[in-house]
């Protein structure tokens, strides 16, 4: 299982200016993260820490989510064509297939 979160990505053709958590209360879209109450700490997160809302650091004891993120803000999302009409989409429903395709490409590399 791969938990996908969302970001707001400010970029041009050559560089990323900023990337932050996607949280657009005005349009009702948002993503978040935290520490799972159900899933054990995976080996790849051992030794990592997180911040409390007050800024204090603590060691992860359970799985931190999301595992990965991608541009999910519809304002900065993906240009697509639907029924002949160009539009921009976003949301973690756009991020999840993006990561699925990336994982598939990595798994298809020789020697894996």
Language-model regions: role of each:
Residues 1-112:
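Extracellular protease catalytic domains of secreted zymogens
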